């Protein structure tokens, strides 16, 4: 509960302390300023676990070698959070969204140009830079490969299936004009797990792919790691 409001609170955290002591109500914060706990994955062994699941119930995507981020925007104010909820907006000033209504996106921040990834080391040079120079922005460009969407035009869609959320994500993506920084994660088509395993084995580090993600088609967006 604290994680969900932390970024919207300011020192000396009077309301938070009162709530923790049961002396006040749960603090209210501007939702666009807050971090929403991300949905995390569990590792599986395709050979071992494939017999337990129906491939028709799942979609697959590549897991890229970047950093997982959440982007929140309202009233044209863009916030970028790391997987742990740290506000890293200042390190990536070029990643902006123009939206009056609340949008919350989930994706992978990658170093790269024209949506072609660069080595992770190039991205590392951008991390923890509070005021990156124009030279650094040019020499170490970045973009976001979008996986999911949590809020669309103020609407909380986390309870919808991933299939339905992907439709909203595509709608957002198509609404962006002159887009240089946002790309959609590719859906991998597969007929069975043998095919998917072959795709996995062909994942190349030279293409900056860490592996594959399986997502159940009817799954809603659940915070944390569900077992």
What positions do the PLM features span?
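Metal-assisted phosphate- and nucleotidyl-transfer catalytic regions
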Residues: 174-225
